[in-house]
Regions:
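Bacterial N-terminal signal peptides that target proteins for export
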Residues: 1-10
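Short hydrophobic/aromatic-rich motifs at helix boundaries and adjacent loops
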Residues: 10, 25-26, 42-44, 80-85, ...
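Residue-level signal for mature regions of secreted extracellular proteins and peptides
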Residues: 16, 32-35, 128
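C-terminal motif of bacterial Sec signal peptides marking the signal peptidase cleavage site
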Residues: 19-22
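Sequence/structural segment immediately N-terminal to covalent heme-attachment motifs in c-type
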Residues: 24-50, 64-76
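Active-site catalytic pocket residues across diverse enzymes, especially alpha/beta-hydrolases
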Residues: 61
């Protein structure tokens, strides 16, 4: 009986790890890894950006106001003036990340959208693809 119980516990833990939040509570682990590798150098690990130079992603009003443009922004970059949380940014060009797949962009957007007190709706790959169609 003890052996069967142990097998059940191990199997349940494996299923939870594969489909659930995992032990760290981070549902968007791939998005977090991609963010760290491609975005955090400028936007910082905390999503706060660099005051006056690089806009924050944490608690950002820009994310909701420009949702339809975000997939293109990640793929192709951003140039020119933008206003985030009432502060104008116009000094640093954000380079696009052309090598990210549609799925990876979706994961990055879901990570950003649910981190640092951002509470945006979850992105789907179809929504990202529709956004990317607009900027081809």
């Amino acid at each position: 009986m003890g052996f069967k119980k142990n097998i059940f516990v191990v199997a349940a833990a494996a299923v939870a790890g594969a489909f659930g939040n995992g032990c760290d509570g981070n549902t968007y682990k791939q998005g977090a890894i991609l963010y760290t590798n491609f975005c955090a150098n400028c936007h910082m690990e905390t999503g706060e950006g660099l005051r006056g130079l690089i806009p924050p992603l944490a608690k950002s009003d820009y994310l909701a106001a420009h949702r339809a443009d975000l997939a293109c922004l990640i793929r192709n970059g951003q140039r020119g003036k933008i206003v985030v949380n009432g502060v104008e940014y116009n000094q640093q060009e954000m380079l696009g990340i052309k090598k990210l797949s549609d799925f990876e962009i979706t994961n990055v957007l879901n990570y950003i959208s649910t981190s640092w007190e951002n509470n945006a709706p979850i992105w789907t790959v179809d929504e990202v693809r529709a956004g990317l169609e607009k900027c081809k």
